[in-house]
């Protein structure tokens, strides 16, 4: 199985509409939903023939728990305080124990939100924060405590071989994406044992090295190598896109500090790539 996934559903009405359009033409089969975002048209969403997943969010917008219960995670107005780096530093600081307890509170709130939808537990996270070892371990604990039978969890530890073998793509690799890939691979090594112990299904992942540049030519060059690895491991593949771009003048309910990502022309590129794939999954 190849999952073609769009993240960040719920950023804005317009962004959601663009993701829905990709799904409606058969270019997507998985959409990850922000628990603290918006779902502009629930009836339309229910008509889409896709798998929906919970896009756990610990970095942007308002938390689902009371601000007074999670002061390390959220400010007095309930807005998340930290980036990925901030959460990681907090997880290895002297405040680790307090942070873990508050993290558990917020993760329970987000899992409970998803329980009410009645949808299968297909789990990933905004900016891949669940790969921080303390977050990963706490998430698995919450799932166990709440007796949640998770169907799938994203494990964004990309194989490096497909990218090493594509010499023609070397000039296009962004240094920031190389760093992200290395960090997530390292964190993947730390989380590997817990993942195996949990028994939750995952898939071979693509979407870090080409983040912001998931165009047709790049994806097609590395996908044959991905298929070989997946066949050898008897694994599914998950390919991540961010087609929910926004235009200037459109409003998001989230923080301005992240808005440059949503207005980025790179997201429009990924939207266009999926439109080229019309009907590919039908």
Describe each model-derived feature in a short phrase.
Residues 125:
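Active-site histidine-anchored catalytic micro-motif
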Residues 128:
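Divalent-metal (often Zn2+) His-rich catalytic cores of metallo-beta-lactamase-fold enzymes
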Residues 1-3, 9, 13-118, 122, ...:
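Terminal accessory/targeting
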């Amino acid at each position: 199985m190849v999952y073609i996934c769009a993240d960040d559903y719920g950023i804005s009405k317009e962004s959601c509409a663009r993701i829905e359009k990709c799904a409606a033409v058969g270019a997507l089969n998985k959409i990850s939903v922000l628990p603290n975002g918006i779902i502009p048209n629930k009836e339309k969403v229910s008509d889409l023939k896709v798998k929906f997943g919970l896009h756990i969010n610990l970095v942007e917008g308002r938390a689902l728990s009371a601000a007074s219960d999670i002061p390390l995670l959220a400010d007095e107005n309930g807005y998340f305080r930290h980036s990925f780096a901030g959460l990681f530093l907090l997880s290895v600081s002297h405040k680790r124990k307090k942070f873990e307890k508050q993290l558990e509170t917020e993760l329970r709130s987000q899992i409970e939100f998803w329980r009410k939808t009645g949808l299968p537990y297909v789990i990933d996270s905004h900016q891949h924060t669940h790969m921080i070892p303390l977050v990963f371990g706490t998430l698995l604990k919450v799932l166990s405590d709440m007796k949640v039978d998770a169907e799938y969890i994203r494990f964004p530890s990309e194989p490096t071989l497909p990218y090493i073998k594509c010499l023609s793509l070397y000039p296009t690799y962004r240094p920031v994406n190389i760093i992200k890939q290395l960090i997530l691979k390292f964190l993947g090594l730390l989380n590997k044992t817990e993942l195996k112990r949990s028994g939750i299904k995952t898939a071979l992942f693509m979407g870090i090295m080409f983040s912001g540049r998931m165009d047709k030519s790049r994806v097609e060059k590395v996908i044959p190598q991905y298929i070989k690895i997946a066949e050898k491991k008897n694994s599914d593949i998950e390919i991540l896109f961010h087609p929910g771009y926004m235009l200037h003048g459109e409003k998001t309910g989230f923080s301005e500090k992240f808005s440059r990502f949503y207005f980025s022309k790179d997201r429009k590129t990924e939207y266009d790539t999926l439109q080229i794939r019309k009907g590919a999954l039908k």
